[in-house]
Design a protein with these regions (language model features):
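Catalytic active-site module of serine/aspartate enzymes centered on a nucleophile-bearing elbow/loop
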Residues: 157-191
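Generic structural signal for small/hydrophobic residues in well-ordered secondary structure
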Residues: 26, 77, 96, 109, ...
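Conserved loop-alpha-helix segment in the C-terminal half of the alpha/beta-hydrolase fold
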Residues: 127-167
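Short aromatic-enriched loop/helix-cap "lid" or pocket-rim segments at secondary-structure transitions
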Residues: 33-39, 139, 146-148, 174-176
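Catalytic nucleophile serine of serine hydrolases
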Residues: 1-2, 26
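Conserved alpha/beta-hydrolase catalytic His-Asp/Glu region
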Residues: 34, 58-130
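Gly/Ala-rich beta-loop-alpha elbow adjacent to hydrolase catalytic centers
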Residues: 4, 8
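Flexible "cap/lid" loop of the alpha/beta hydrolase fold
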Residues: 9, 13, 20-62
Length: 191
């Protein structure tokens, strides 16, 4: 899911023929990556140097982390990620909150928000020979379904784009039954 999709694509590239298929759920599009400058709007291109400078400063990244590493804030973010509201509970909040209390979690966060020149899914699709399924939440607030459709239209190894109605960034949590059925169908089709 999300950035894990890009990691999975890179792993599939390395594994070559040992990868039989790939399921990407709301794969990260990494809209802030430097390689996407030409596709960004003028305002984003103007703001990008400022954003990069600010988030590279520990005082800023630590402040952002300390504000985000709060169960109330995590719950607010989850409400955006899960527009149906399904499966947002104390257990999920705790699962996401607990790692923020570990040693070096601030540095991990700082590293993550400073990834401005890394792998893009679009750079990896054509290096993966296995069939790919995209599963997308219809109401994902961060990863554009329009771009997912463009990926499918432009990359032959993307065999399916399945959209889960009313789901957001984590359709596997909001609607696990439908997500699992779609994955099983893809596995059957690609045997």
């Amino acid at each position: 899911n999300s950035i894990g999709g890009v990691v999975s694509l890179k792993a599939a590239e390395i594994l070559k023929e040992n990868c039989n298929g790939l399921v990407l759920i709301d794969c990260a599009q990494r809209t802030m990556d430097d390689k996407r400058l030409k596709r960004s709007d003028v305002l984003m291109n103007l703001l990008r140097p400022l954003i990069k400078t600010l988030v590279s400063k520990r005082i800023i990244s630590n402040t952002l982390f300390e504000r985000a590493a709060n169960p109330r804030v995590i719950k607010q973010i989850l409400k955006k990620a899960y527009p149906s509201g399904k499966n947002i509970d104390e257990e999920l909040i705790e699962i996401l909150y607990n790692p923020t209390q570990r040693r070096n979690s601030k540095e991990a966060f700082r590293g993550f928000i400073n990834l401005f020149d890394d792998y893009l899914a679009t750079d990896l699709f054509d290096k993966v020979y296995a069939p790919i399924q995209l599963i997308w939440g219809e109401r994902d607030p961060w990863e554009s379904i329009t771009e997912a459709q463009s990926w499918k239209d432009n990359h032959n190894n993307i065999q399916r784009l399945d959209v889960i109605k009313e789901a957001g960034h984590c359709p596997h949590d909001e609607n696990p039954e439908e997500t699992n059925n779609l994955i099983c169908k893809f596995i059957q089709e690609t045997k």
